[in-house]
């Protein structure tokens, strides 16, 4: 009897996993934990507009992963916020650097980043969400609230410490 039950359970499990759930869409995260928006999964993020190719940022871990990608050399990637983000308890390192700043589009999508703390000390240490926005970079539809931005020797700003004709 036990063998028959186990065989039946196994058959049910195999049949269930082979079913097509046409309405469900899988979302693939990359190694950094970020999810890239595609035409197929865009509706899962409740986005208005075409954000295919953008990285969806829903929480502080996503924002940190996005910053890490940019700081590792991917200066032209795009991002869209899908929720308000509370950065309480995090010591922020700006996105990009002053030698080779951010060149992509960062769309806040009407959301805000709150309690971002970026206190920088040392020679030429800038403070802000972004270190430097380069020509043709875009930051839009973004609110900043209750942040602290200090630099002992250089510039500080909530969105960007420096801008080279960004929009």
Region roles according to the model:
Residues 1-5:
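Positively charged n-region of N-terminal signal peptides that target proteins for export
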Residues 6-9, 30:
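Intrinsically disordered, low-complexity repeat segments enriched in small/polar residues
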Residues 20-24:
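Cellulosome-associated attachment modules in secreted, modular CAZymes
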Residues 27-167:
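Surface-exposed repetitive/solenoidal architectures
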Residues 10, 14-18:
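Hydrophobic core
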Residues 18-19, 75:
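Residue-level signature of transmembrane alpha-helix interfaces in integral membrane proteins
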